[in-house]
């Protein structure tokens, strides 16, 4: 009897062992399949964020993948914004959302020392906790600001795989702001829920990506002119040979990049030096410096135009009043007078499209000590304001303009602009991508894998 029992127990042990191995193997296979379909946490060389233009506002936006489970969140592209902010008061659901306590290391990293108390709701929810960090967010279009809750959650972004978009990679504790809902109610494209800040600040998108993945401190912007096709932002070194398979279609464009020094203001904004604007062979140099205060990082005491802000939150390039007056006068002198018609706001100089079939004069930005010239394509400075009416796409910013020149999104479209933060320089092509037979939508493969 005892011998039979021992034999039965031996068989049971063997059976259970095989069952355990089978279940364990099945579980591992299932887990592997699950992870293969999910964002990976590997270290990429290059990250890609597709960007679209909004036809009604002329501004650009991107779908950011956030939360758990991941979902797309449409956000305005704000080149000079300090951080990513999104409204959280409605429909924010995530199992990985956290609100760091006041005076925590996350608060220090975000450079905020203000505590936040929620008064909007009697129950806690994303964006509404007490004794958390307060973070001030701004709508860059309306200039409205509001205090919100510093938060952290999962963010995912595409890596590259050969010449294609690769799997998504995750930042598990990405810092951002849950901002007041009123900030997203005016000025933004429809359905956009916040803004994506790329300024030089501790928790801007690119700085968190650089830190988490160990990428070179460089990002490149290529904005599409067409709302039906994507442009892109690339994070990392596009000149790295390891990325050649992905950028193979743009090697000639990269080879011809011209670089000019980059200046970053105390607010983390991006400026380049502009010595003059040239219309055909005529230079536009104002007699008075347009800047408000000599303490500005972009102030120059000479008669030069000075620092030009690069921005994506103005659809058109904005000139201070003194520069605008001289520039439009010189431009008008190089256009047929009989073609000029009543201006259509917000522009100051418009023409009958049928009477300017000969084209517009060339417009160049003369940059760093005349060594670099950025030619603005007529497609980037002439705007179809109405049927049959084409306007000069520059806007009068008044006497209190933030900068002498603010290069707007329309100016940047169909240009590859490289922000090399490690070497404090900006790269661009002297001519638009059209001269290479390319557009921002086909310069890189932006199709989902």
From Swiss-Prot:
SUPFAM superfamilies tied to this protein: Acid proteases
Function: Sulfur-rich seed storage protein that remains undegraded at germination.
Induction field: By sulfur deficiency.
Location(s) in or outside the cell: Secreted, Extracellular space
Protein name (database record): Gamma conglutin 1
PROSITE patterns linked to this entry: PEPTIDASE_A1
Tissue: Expressed in developing cotyledons and in the embryonic axis of germinating seeds. Accumulates in seeds, especially in the protein bodies of developing cotyledonary cells (at protein level). Also detected, at low levels, in plumules and radicles.
Organism: Lupinus angustifolius
């Amino acid at each position: 009897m005892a011998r039979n029992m021992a034999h039965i127990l031996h068989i049971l042990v063997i059976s259970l062992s095989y069952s355990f191995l089978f279940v364990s193997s099945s579980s591992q296979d299932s887990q592997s399949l699950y992870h293969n379909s999910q964002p990976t946490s590997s270290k990429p060389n290059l990250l890609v964020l597709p960007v679209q233009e909004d036809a009604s506002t002329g501004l650009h936006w991107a779908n950011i993948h956030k939360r758990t489970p991941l979902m797309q969140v449409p956000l305005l592209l704000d080149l000079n914004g300090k951080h990513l902010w999104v409204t959280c008061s409605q429909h924010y659901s995530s199992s990985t959302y956290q609100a760091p306590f006041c005076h925590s290391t996350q608060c220090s990293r975000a450079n905020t020392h203000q505590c936040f108390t929620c008064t909007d709701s009697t129950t806690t929810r994303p964006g509404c906790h007490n004794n958390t960090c307060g973070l001030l967010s701004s709508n860059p279009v309306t200039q409205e600001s509001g205090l919100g809750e510093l938060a952290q959650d999962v963010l995912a972004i595409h890596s590259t795989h050969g010449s294609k978009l690769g799997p998504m990679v995750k930042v598990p504790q990405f810092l951002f702001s849950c901002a007041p809902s009123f900030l997203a109610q005016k000025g933004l494209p429809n359905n956009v829920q916040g803004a994506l800040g790329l300024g030089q600040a501790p928790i801007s998108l690119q700085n968190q990506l650089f830190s988490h993945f160990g990428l070179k401190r460089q990002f490149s912007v290529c904005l599409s002119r067409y709302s039906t096709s994507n442009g892109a932002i690339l994070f990392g070194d596009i000149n790295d040979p390891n990325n050649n398979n992905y950028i193979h279609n743009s090697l000639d464009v990269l080879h011809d990049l011209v670089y000019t020094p980059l200046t970053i203001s105390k607010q983390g904004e991006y400026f380049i030096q502009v010595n003059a604007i040239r219309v055909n062979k005529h230079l536009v140099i104002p007699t008075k410096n347009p800047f408000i205060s000599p303490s500005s990082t972009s102030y120059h005491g000479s008669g030069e135009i000075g620092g030009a802000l690069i921005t994506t939150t103005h659809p058109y390039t904005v000139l201070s009043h003194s520069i605008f007056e001289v520039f439009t006068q010189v431009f008008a002198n190089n256009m047929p007078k009989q073609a000029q018609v009543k201006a259509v706001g917000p522009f100051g100089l418009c023409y009958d499209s049928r009477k300017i079939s000969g084209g517009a004069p060339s417009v160049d930005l003369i940059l760093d000590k005349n060594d670099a010239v950025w030619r603005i394509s007529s497609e980037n400075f002439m705007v179809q304001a109405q049927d049959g009416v084409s306007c000069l796409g520059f806007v009068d910013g008044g006497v209190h303009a933030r900068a002498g020149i603010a290069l707007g999104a329309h100016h940047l479209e169909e240009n590859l602009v490289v922000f090399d933060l490690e070497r404090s320089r900006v790269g661009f092509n002297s001519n638009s991508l059209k001269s290479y037979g390319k557009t921002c939508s086909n310069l890189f493969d932006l199709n989902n894998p």
